[in-house]
Amino acid sequence: VAFLTHLHSDHTTGYPDLIFTPWVLERDTPLKVFGPAGIKSMTENVLEAYGSDIRYRIDGSEPANEIGWNVEVDEIDEGMIYKDDLVEVIAFKVNHGSWENAFGYKFITADKTIVISGDTAPSDKLIEISKGSDILVHEVYSQSGFDRRSDVWKNYHSKHHTSTIELAEIANITKPKLLLLTHILFWGSSEEHIIDEIRSNYSGKVLVGEDLS
């Protein structure tokens, strides 16, 4: 099962790999995908673009199964979108500038609550839904790096993303047991400097996320 926050290219260029590589490695069930409006069309276009590859693997000498390349897509709105024996998933809209359909997700298990911000400027809805979470995974940009940007980029980033100073304020309100930083815009800063900027206004536990580690 996969959950997409929004359809910006930096969040979707790996989508074909997510569909096809596990199938090549013998996944024999469809991939289940939840995402915003537009994900159905994107999925159809990806499958069409790779049509020759799919047909070759199924009809040629490669013994690929005929099921694992399929995708079952649900276009979501806010609220509970998924539940099984292990986890309940709640989607909520976030403030990613003028991008209409951007979501965060709250994952609830028997012993943990994890909130993923997606791409967002400071969001009252995210603050409310993430209060008391075990882990808050939140995007961030360096305030000192931002200060060196041009005015036109400052205007863009301030409406689409969250600074270290703003995130410290959010964490002070929501009080997660762990604040995990992701989608970091460094602009010449280091991981250590990003952490220091947050810790200047927040005393809780904070770590830089490392994908696939």
What are these regions (language model features)?
Residues 1-115, 193-213:
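Binuclear metal-dependent hydrolase catalytic cores
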